[in-house]
């Protein structure tokens, strides 16, 4: 708990430093209406609250407006295809989305390579080998454990294998049918272990699951309230409850875990001016300033940049991420979810 308290204190200090600096810079132009020197368009599949917090912070500091357009993954690919087929440079300059979408866009030729000093600092596992995209954040699946359970049990499950072997434990998790981050865990385990072993792990875990929740935050709240002993949850939601002083400790599966990785790519056929502005913004997303902008709105995504203070002071920075990418077609995903329903959730011997 002390490690997370230090994380929160340091984040608060960083927020104060940025706030003081911003207040000083804005005092000279107080009363004057500011107009952005430039603006460009970015496609994103992230929640509007996240993109809005980033855009507001960036425009306030650099007077450049990022016009985010929220779209689904398929809609983004459709827009990029149309832009790629156009005869002139127009439309979006940046894509801010999950790794799978960026990989698909790169293969289709909808992105152009971008190399920078900031991007070079990111581990190879978080970026495209030919630099068509660079990861900026990741949100892993972790074990959120109630502190009372910790005090009464010595054999803490710190791996999927151990969790599957536990008997005296109440588990909470989000329904694989309810959220992409949750179903991504199932697909990732299948990609990493194979179908047989992945389903066997979940068959053993199933009897201890008290409830499948609809939302990502619900299992974390249940662990904090003592309604379950351990929840399988996304770290971003877990850190929100840790920040609110819920009695939760985070355990990172030592045998690996899934993570949603978010990154940036520069769109093909963006104008040279917009592409350059998008590159500068993409680099800014790899800074502590961007992390502070997110933390001020209670978004706790982990940065991929090891040179930032945010990364260096976080205790879970060495978490092991599954190596194999969970890329399945929509039809394959439907089949896997249907099998999970029949062979795990509602399976009767």
Task: Identify what each model region corresponds to.
Residues 45-49, 74, 89-92, 96-220, ...:
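Extracytoplasmic ligand-binding site segments that recognize negatively charged/polar headgroups
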Residues 139, 171-177, 201-206, 212, 244-268, 284-307, ...:
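Periplasmic-binding protein-like
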Residues 112-118, 132-134, 161, 246-258, ...:
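Short beta-strand->loop
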Residues 311-349:
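Extracellular/periplasmic bilobal clamshell ligand-binding domains
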Residues 144-149, 261-274, 293-294:
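A bilobed periplasmic-binding-protein/Venus flytrap-type ligand-binding module shared by bacterial periplasmic
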Residues 100-104, 224-225, 229-247:
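A ligand-binding cleft/hinge motif common to bilobed small-molecule-binding domains
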